[in-house]
Amino acid sequence: MSLKPLLLIPALSAVLLLSACAGPMPKAAPSEAWIGLKEEAPNDLMAERVDGKRVDDGRFFEVSPGDHRLDVTLFAEEPGDNDQQNCEGRVEYEHFKAGERYTLVESSLGSTVRASLLDGHGKEVAATQDFNCMPG
């Protein structure tokens, strides 16, 4: 018997365990604005705070209509480099609407990292300044 098939068992177990932890995405409340997150591979973008208060689920933001400040953390990896950077960013937007879906899209060019807040029509309505990055 070959050793390779036996090595697949721990790898598959880890994948299944990690996917089970996340759970399904909750349904968006019609009275709230929903902000999804989108990052460039291999980076991970996580929701951290709304108006200074920690969020329960780092995969999205859900806010009441109006003015809010969203804080995010980006775990950035350079292709071919094992060093990870932890980057913090903030976006402020005054016109969140109930029932509207938004997307916070991370993009990077060289060492410059930013994120754009897009409304449901794909129009940029706000953006972060450059992220503050430190070695992770």
Question: What is each model feature region?
Answer:
Residues 1-24:
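Sec-dependent bacterial lipoprotein signal peptides
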Residues 21-136:
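Short loop/turn and low-complexity linker motifs enriched in small/turn-promoting residues
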